[in-house]
From Swiss-Prot:
Gene expressing this chain: RBP45A
Start and end residues of each RRM domain: 60-140, 154-233, 260-332
Family, as annotated: Belongs to the polyadenylate-binding RBP45 family.
Annotated source species: Arabidopsis thaliana (Mouse-ear cress)
Segments crossing the lipid bilayer: none
Stated name of the protein: Polyadenylate-binding protein RBP45A
Lineage of source species: Eukaryota, Viridiplantae, Streptophyta, Embryophyta, Tracheophyta
Function: Heterogeneous nuclear ribonucleoprotein (hnRNP)-protein binding the poly(A) tail of mRNA and probably involved in some steps of pre-mRNA maturation.
Length: 387
């Protein structure tokens, strides 16, 4: 396993200053590929036994990937036999051919045991093979939600990762230099389970986070030099009215304290409702998300005004599906006269002027470069930087 340098001397430097950080954040937001889980979609459709966890702390199953055809349930159980607390295993097979799909699940007696196995085995060599374990939680976010109550942390983006880099390898690379590292996450493709070439490292100490951004930039993790950058934070700072001073007055919806609906224009034809939920959901609780069939626009309604303002301020002008999206205030569906935009009526012919409620704002909202630097508490909320 590749070890990090004994010291960070000679590491590549990144420019300092808030302007540079903001530019890097803009790059992050231009690739809105939110990963609420690092395992293939199939893992969310399968639960060992009758498990139906009500919360992340109830999840006691792990996803295991990169399985070869000969790796069956007996092999998986034997691998984890020394833990003494694996209760069952399942390899997912093609219904027509009976061949392994390359992944499966292991259930343990408790969440704490599963978590210990994940931390111990992930990235370690698999017995009788020349490959390493690829493990993750069997439910999206199961290993992330608990971090939200552990106090503040500070996160960096790590790009240009080699395909073989695992959570363990990435974490170990930084832990050998910085004692406050709390964990690392390599983002995987949902369909293939393979690395997307970037990830995140979490620190307990902000000073070490800032040092790592400079000292580790250009250092090697496995076979490639890393590209380090900031990770946008939606929770690190409280909402500040100054953030939105330049978005006020864009249209009537902005002046309505009860309006939490955002119009999303310029959508790529391939963008789905679920993609909008994934992207806009990072800023707060969503009530409704709708893309009219055959239209290049959509609507997102939040549970509160602050979340809507935050999303509008950050996401306006960012890239989604190859297109720059343009945001403005929509009309509140709480008003009976505005129900049509959700029921399939009024929003098919939205007027181009902002005063119509569906049009684009005359000027994109000015974004405060000081408001979003830091790290999300859950890895799933991060975005990839532009390569």
């Amino acid at each position: 396993m590749q070890q990090p340098p004994s010291n960070a001397a000679g590491a590549g430097q990144i420019p300092s200053g808030q302007q540079h950080l903001w530019m890097m954040m803009q790059q992050q937001q231009q690739q809105q590929q939110m990963q609420l889980s690092a395992a293939p979609l199939g893992q969310h459709q399968y639960g060992i036994g009758s498990q139906n966890p009500g919360s992340a702390s109830d999840v006691k199953s792990l996803w295991i990937g990169d399985l070869q055809q000969w790796m069956d349930e007996n092999y998986i159980m034997s691998v984890f036999a020394q833990s003494g607390e694996a209760t069952s295993a399942k390899v997912i097979r093609n219904k027509l051919t009976g061949q392994s799909e390359g992944y499966g699940f292991i259930e343990f007696v408790s969440h704490s045991v599963a978590e210990r196995v994940l931390q111990t085995y992930n990235g370690a060599p698999m017995p009788s093979t020349e490959q390493t374990f690829r493990l993750n939680w069997a439910q999206a976010g199961a290993g992330e939600k608990r971090f939200q109550t552990e106090g503040p942390d500070h996160t960096i983006f790590v790009g240009d990762l080699a395909p073989e880099v695992t959570d363990y390898m990435l974490s170990d690379t930084f832990k050998n230099v910085y004692g406050s590292v709390k964990g690392a996450k390599v983002v995987l493709d949902r369909t293939t389970g393979r690395s997307k070439g970037y990830g995140f490292v979490r620190f307990a100490d902000e000073n070490e986070q800032m040092r790592a951004m400079t000292e580790m930039n250009g250092q090697y993790c496995s076979t490639r030099p890393m590209r380090i950058g900031p990770a946008a934070n939606k929770n690190a700072l409280p909402m500040q009215p100054a953030m939105y001073q330049n978005t006020q007055g864009a249209n009537a919806g902005d002046n309505d304290p009860n309006n939490t609906t955002i119009f999303v224009g310029g959508l790529d034809a391939n963008v789905t409702d679920d993609e909008l939920k994934s992207i806009f959901g990072q800023f707060g609780e969503l009530l409704h998300v709708k893309i009219p069939p055959g239209k290049r626009c959509g609507f997102v309604q939040y549970a509160n005004k602050a979340s809507a303002e935050h999303a509008l301020s950050v996401l306006n002008g960012t890239q989604l599906g190859g297109q720059s999206i343009r945001l403005s205030w929509g009309r509140s569906p709480n008003k009976q006269s505005d129900q049509a935009q959700w029921n399939g009526g009024g929003y098919y012919g939205y007027p181009p002027q902002p005063q119509g409620g569906y049009g684009y704002a005359a000027q994109p909202p000015t974004q405060d470069p000081n408001a979003y630097y830091g790290g999300y508490t859950g890895y799933g909320n991060y975005q990839q930087q532009r390569q």
